[in-house]
Amino acid sequence: ILDNVESRGLGDVYKIQIDVFGSRSRAYVQVQNGCDHRCTFCIIPYGRGNSRSVPAGVIVDQIKRLVDKGFNEVVLTGVDLTSWGADLPSAPKLGDLVMRILKLVPDLSRLRISSIDSIEVDENLMQAIATEKRLMPHLHLSLQHGDDLILKRMKRRHLRKDAIAFCEEARKVRPEITFGADIIAGFPTETEEHFQNSVNLIKECELTWLHIFPYSPREGTPAAKMPQVNGNQIKKRAAVLRDLGKKQVKSHLSSQLGKNHNILMENAYMGRTEQFTEVKFDKQQVEGSIVLGKITDANEKQLFATAI
């Protein structure tokens, strides 16, 4: 298989394809590398080149091997994951890959997809989100900002309304879904009004897991040549977003009290729900197993559970 992959110019993707978390609990499978887009703040395309996809058959074979070795969960990763397939024959979409994995690897208990560009989500992927219970109800979105002018200057392909519409639609078809997101604070030319639109977007989309990045110029990128925001102001805005993120997490955790979850054990006492929420058990469990647990309590960072 490796020879076939390298003959397609995909050896670089294949060689870093699998990362293991814990002992037989979760495996990360890189199915795509590089990026065809040129966001004005990003240096990745200059270092990793254009988008390259691992063929679906290779991915399925690898996941079958992981399942045979005892892994209960696989996470599909990539630099620009939703662009997967564009460079392959017939240009399949990420949704096609997800459906194929779930069909051909019936013993895979849980499949996750990592950071995605919501504007590129295809019909089959949305269908999988709605109907495939083995596809976990947790999506991390590459949103970056909540203001249309800043999004344009970032050279993003979505508008604020697109992000809101996607979250509303996904929540409509999968009510238990949670969202994470990347948000940049202090992008060049960002005013207080622009910043408030990011704050409001987090609330309107009901984002839970936030990755906040204070803007830092990357040499050679268009954004580095734009008028910069004062460094102290960037830090203050990033702090505001992080504080909001803590409140969003606390709200989510509180909403889970009394509920039952299937929890994948990362070690003897700690695991993750379907929504990737961290859970600590009162008694030791089998690492790598999936345990049905009742949520009994929560603090600011995690849930607590008893096995049922």
Where are these regions (language model features)?
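Terminal RNA-binding accessory module
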Residues: 225-308
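Single conserved hydrophobic/aromatic residue that forms the stacking wall/gate
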Residues: 1-14
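Conserved, mostly hydrophobic/aromatic
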Residues: 39, 59, 76, 113, ...
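Conserved alpha-helical substructure of the radical SAM core
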Residues: 48-75
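Radical SAM enzyme [4Fe-4S]-AdoMet core and its adjacent flexible, acidic
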Residues: 85-104, 154, 160, 214-247
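Canonical Radical SAM [4Fe-4S] cluster-binding loop centered on the CxxxCxxC motif
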Residues: 21-57
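Conserved SAM/AdoMet-binding glycine-rich loop
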Residues: 68-192
